[in-house]
Amino acid sequence: MSRSSKKGPYIEPSLMKKVQAMKAADKKKPIKTWSRRSTIFPDFVGLNFEVHNGKSFVNVYVTEDMIGHKLGEFAQTRTFKQHTSNRKDLAK
């Protein structure tokens, strides 16, 4: 279920302060965040984020196509363990 349009998109206030400080200083240092629920705003385009996936931080470079999505969508929390196949099929 999506958020009500009357409320508007959510962004962590501390994250917005960090983004504004980075824009003002023209720095390219990645912004480390645990806020996976924050919506990507147009101000974020061109910035690097390190989004926590529960175990480590994943580098996310924000492009224009990502606007409106959540930061957590680009930092996968689960790794896919590939199913093993028969060894006889691999030998052929």
Swiss-Prot record:
Listed GO CC annotations: cytoplasm; small ribosomal subunit
Keywords, alphabetical: Ribonucleoprotein, Ribosomal protein, RNA-binding, rRNA-binding
Pfam families: Ribosomal_S19 (PF00203)
Gene Ontology biological process terms from the UniProt entry: ribosomal small subunit assembly; translation
InterPro entries referenced in this protein's UniProt entry, alphabetically: Ribosomal_uS19 (IPR002222), Ribosomal_uS19_bac-type (IPR005732), Ribosomal_uS19_CS (IPR020934), Ribosomal_uS19_SF (IPR023575)
GO molecular function: rRNA binding; structural constituent of ribosome
Key word Ribosomal protein present: yes
Family per similarity comment: Belongs to the universal ribosomal protein uS19 family.
PANTHER family per the UniProt record, alphabetical: RIBOSOMAL PROTEIN S19P FAMILY MEMBER (PTHR11880), SMALL RIBOSOMAL SUBUNIT PROTEIN US19M (PTHR11880:SF8)
Role summary: Protein S19 forms a complex with S13 that binds strongly to the 16S ribosomal RNA.
Protein name: Small ribosomal subunit protein uS19
Species this chain originates from: Malacoplasma penetrans (strain HF-2)
